[in-house]
Regions:
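Short acidic/glycine-rich loops and adjacent helix/strand connectors
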Residues: 1-125
Length: 125
C-alpha cells in the first residue's frame, strides 16, 4: 500500500516452492481519475477504509487461520506516507497481537527481488 492500491497477500513457502495463496487488490482509480493523478490525502483515507476488509478477504481466500501465519510483512517505503502508514500500522498491529515477527519490506527491493518468487537465482544479478 505504497501509493493508490491497497493489497494484502498470504504467501507460503513449502520445500523451497513459494505459493501465493491469496492476493487481494483494491484499486483507487475511480477515486483519483477526476484529478488527473493520485491525491495523497484521498489515497490514505481510502487505504484506511479498506485495509481490515482486505485482510479478512485474503485470510478467507487462503483458507488459513491467523495461527498458521509465521510472519507479517508490509511495504515500509518508499511511497506515499499515508498509504505506508496505514499498511505498516495494520501489519504491526497484527504482528503484535499474534506475537509474530514483523518484516519491513523496501518497496523498490520488493520489485527487484520479485523474480525470486519463481526462480531462485544467485546474487549479484
Amino acid at each position: 500500500s505504497s501509493c493508490d492500491e491497497t493489497s494484502v497477500s498470504v504467501v507460503e513457502k513449502v520445500n523451497g516452492q513459494i505459493n501465493i495463496l491469496s492476493n487481494i487488490v483494491k484499486s483507487q482509480l475511480d477515486i483519483h481519475q477526476d484529478f488527473g493523478g493520485v491525491v495523497p490525502e484521498l489515497a490514505a483515507r481510502a487505504h484506511s477504509d479498506v485495509i481490515d476488509k482486505l485482510i479478512k478477504m485474503a485470510m478467507d481466500k487462503s483458507r488459513l487461520s491467523f495461527r498458521n501465519i509465521d510472519a507479517i510483512a508490509s511495504t515500509a517505503g518508499p511511497g506515499l506516507m499515508g498509504g505506508l502508514l496505514v499498511g505498516v500500522v495494520a501489519a504491526k498491529t497484527l504482528s503484535s497481537a499474534l506475537k509474530k515477527p514483523f518484516i519491513a519490506v523496501n518497496h523498490l527491493e520488493g520489485h527487484a527481488l520479485s523474480i525470486r518468487l519463481e526462480t531462485d537465482i544467485d546474487f549479484p544479478y
